[in-house]
């Protein structure tokens, strides 16, 4: 009984030990269950995160759609503003055309009036000839009433003296005619020089147009190159999107397979005997993980290489930006050449305006001289011969004036042709600018799309990296679990050895257990084979995925580099577009105010023109009355001269008759000579004294008449010149006067430069500075200054002061303005580049 009790106690101890072992096993099972629950929770969290990611992706898509709608609205608004600006510009253009047509209509009316007045002058000349014939008849009647011989002798003496003086005057007038011919030759030479300058200007304009056409072809080639680049970028983005989709599908499949594997591992972890064999599998996995780490290092090296490639791409971007800057500079050069052509055309128009002002000044002088002719018209009794000569000269002058008119018309036609060419060039530039703007908008839209695609790709890549990190953490946890299980298995082996020593008595029971264990081993081997097959398949799939991931990473890095380049270009373009939009808005607002001012000023100018026309009409009427008076006086003078000629002829005949009678009467009157001598001496003394006084008075009067007659002749020439609107009046001044005029007109270059009515603003302006805005000098101020400088009182003096017009202070050289703009753009570009480089460094860090 005692022995049995001892045996029972031993058995009870063994049972207690086995119960403790069973409790430890139960604890291990609970721990594995806890790990499985943790894995379930992590999988649920990952599912929630995926749902959130999808929800956020939908939100981003909606935001992208809203942004696209806003951008389209902005584009439509900008196009509406542009259309409004073009409409305003066209309205102003039509108004200017209407004003130009009105001015041309007025010029045609003036020409018609001038032709009518010429016809009237021809009729008056015919009437004058008729009156001259009548005066001849009257002179024959007056010859019969003149019988006194002594008075006729005195008159013949005086007429001889007058003839001498007239010969002197003729000589003087011939010298003046030579001087005028020299001045005409000089004017012709100047006109030829102007024609040559115009030809040179036309040649330069043709050359510029050819160069611009070549440059436009280059721009079109550059456009085609850019379009090819854009298509390539689109193709690359499409391929990247397809690859990302395939990768997403593969990741989803891998996640499903991982879930299945986790369920199988949970089932197999309940069995303790499998842990021994699972140890080997864990070692294999460790080796595979080492290989994965080596591959990750390779990937890091490839990332470094990709960064180098990104740097090279940045260098290429800089080269492209430099090319764009050179193209922009070429565009600026073309604009400068256009401005030079505009300035040359303006100079030619200014020269024409100066000639018109000179004609107006000469008209004013003619008006003053006509006033002086009214006083001197009574003293023109003995100048009929000179008037005939001067009539011939006037015809010559009129022919010269007509020739000069024709030359002026040719010059005006050439100027109009140049203006038409300028308008064509401006239209071409505007069309080119519109094309650039459209291309910029298309590039913006494409870049926005590429940015959004790149952002989505980056987000997906980041999520994949996070998933990879999670998988790495899981692998590390599994490694730790495998190590713990291997330690636990070693401890179990030691305990089993102790139990084998103790279980010699229970070998029968163990045999039964061994049979069960053999069955379990067979099942384990079959499970191992299945597991190995699954692991081999998974390893192959993992290797394929690694290769595809490497390729995708390379492509993603390339896409990142391309996206960075596109983002940089887009930011630069956005900044420039924003600056240009702001400047265009400011310029449009300012130009609106200035257009209103211009319209008001043009209305005031039209009022002034109407007042001037009324004044000119009043002056024309006064001149016509004066012409009629002067012609009447000339007719009376011609009649008197014819009477005097007939008297001279009669006196000559009477002298011959008296000489014959004296020869016959000499013999008869020798005795009465002594008595008659005393009486004749007394009479002769009484007659000579008044004749001497008369000769002195006549000499003094004629010396004044010569000067006045010169003025009268000049006025007659100028009166005929005023009948035409665009004619040059030719004077016959002395040599001293010619020298004085040459000295006076030396500084005409400065006056021409200063004499400006400015109406300029930059079409291709990019900035809203004060120098690029309208700078104006109203024509009212210029007309008032011209009138003050050329007042009618000032023309009485021989000196003429040159016109001096003050230039406005707002004018600045165009070269300085462009340099300021280029410096500002350079500083803005430098700051933008620095900021972008800093942002890129932060992203890479």
Curated annotation (Swiss-Prot):
It is found in: Nucleus; Chromosome; Chromosome, Centromere. Residues 59-215 are annotated as: Interaction with SYCE3. The modification Phosphoserine is found at residue 676. The molecule is in a coiled coil structure that is formed by 4 polypeptide chains. The N-terminal and C-terminal regions exhibit a prominent seven-residues periodicity. Structural component of synaptonemal complexes. Homotetramer that consists of an N-terminal four-helical bundle that bifurcates into two elongated C-terminal dimeric coiled coils. This tetrameric building block potentially self-assembles into a supramolecular zipper-like lattice to mediate meiotic chromosome synapsis. Self-assembly is likely initiated by local proton density at chromosome axis, which is predicted to trigger antiparallel back to back assembly of adjacent C-terminal ends into tetrameric structures that anchor to chromosomal DNA. Major component of the transverse filaments of synaptonemal complexes, formed between homologous chromosomes during meiotic prophase. Required for normal assembly of the central element of the synaptonemal complexes. Required for normal centromere pairing during meiosis. Required for normal meiotic chromosome synapsis during oocyte and spermatocyte development and for normal male and female fertility. This is Synaptonemal complex protein 1. It comes from Mesocricetus auratus.
